[in-house]
């Protein structure tokens, strides 16, 4: 498993992974449309295949993870990519890392909290507002849970 910074040469692979997992290269988060083709981050490769990506943006004194996507689970890909975001926050003298997930994403809530993140807040109804901007957002998410709220998690340096 190798990690490489997203650059001009490999951006298309980052974009492909993001589009595969988010069905678009634009996401709506915190009532903002985010162009994922402009995000900094890292890719993970294994045996020549791109299997994971993490992207982030600068949010003042915090680094904000905008995507963490992996094609494999249980092999440490997500953990290694998330560690890169934490390291970037430290190197850039940030106070920490923030990210948003949705109320249906139980696996993500488990994943992030067992890696030092805690819930900072819940924006009730945020996904409904996002759906007005991006109508392709489904009404139901994982486990047929109604997709309604954004949950912000934070890790402090």
Describe these PLM feature segments.
Residues 1-3:
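Extreme N-terminal starter segment of soluble prokaryotic enzymes
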Residues 5-73, 79-83, 156:
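Acetyl-CoA-dependent GNAT
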Residues 8, 144-157:
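Glyoxalase I/VOC metalloenzyme domain signal
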Residues 25, 32-36, 47, 55, ...:
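Conserved acyl-donor/pantetheine-binding loop and adjacent beta-alpha core of acyl/acetyltransferases
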Residues 75-89, 110-114:
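Conserved acetyl-CoA-binding loop-helix of GNAT-fold acetyltransferases
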Residues 89-101:
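Conserved GNAT acetyl-CoA-binding A-motif
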Residues 99-108, 124-131:
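Conserved beta-strand-loop-alpha-helix junction that forms the acyl-donor binding cleft
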Residues 113-121:
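Conserved acetyl-CoA-binding loop of GNAT-fold acetyltransferases
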